Amino acid sequence: KFFNPGDWRSGYYRDQSWMLASAVTTPEQFFSQLYGDPNVEHDFHSVGRNMNSHYATKNRDQNGNWAALTAQLNTAADMAPTAGQMPRALGLAAASKTFRNVEELKEFANLSNNGNEVCFCTIGDASTSEGHFWEVVNAAAVMQEPLAIFIWDDGYGISVPKAMQTTKASISEALKGFQIEQGTNGLNIYKVKAWDYAGMCEVFDEGIRLARQT
């Protein structure tokens, strides 16, 4: 609903519902990935070269020309290493802002709509213990990039309760020092229950709107 044409996703292997709901993938492609089908007609995401639930969209056509990225939902090729998606997400967000700020890039209207794109980054709560996560959060807060980070918190990480690996057993509590305040840089931090659809829509509406204005 808030993932618009031109936006980017840098996520991980628990985004099946999102990719299906956005029609970035289909149930048939999901099972083609599961069985490692090497037929590009059945699975263009990785053509049998990656694990299942690893997604990617095409940046170029068969002739090597740039695709109209502003007309499609974009996802960078997923990586299996935990938190590996974080640095790339920052780069994609920074690219959007660069298109907005650099006059010489305005001619590439098929790549960016004047930098109005947001990079959506997903990560599990256990992977927030990785160094990549903290480096990117700090850099995004300092640089004020259009990056929206979604932390899927199910209470466990590889069967270990989050109290054993996350300060205060809550990543949102641990991140409180990054909360933006008037006259400072930082991040807007939200906490919402995944089963509360109306609540999520309200939070996403505000958060993504602010990210697009960054």
Residue ranges and their predicted role:
Residues 80, 192-193:
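Glycine- and other small-residue-rich loops at beta-strand/loop junctions that grip anionic moieties
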Residues 1-145, 150, 161-179, 184:
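Cofactor-binding active-site loop characterized by glycine-rich and histidine/acidic residues
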Residues 155-158:
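Short gly/pro/ser/thr-enriched loop/turn and capping motifs at secondary-structure boundaries
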Residues 151-153, 193-196, 204:
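Active-site proximal loops enriched in glycine and acidic residues that flank catalytic Cys/His/Asp
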Residues 197-214:
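Structural signature of the thiamine diphosphate
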Residues 187-191:
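Structural signal for short hydrophobic segments within the conserved structured cores
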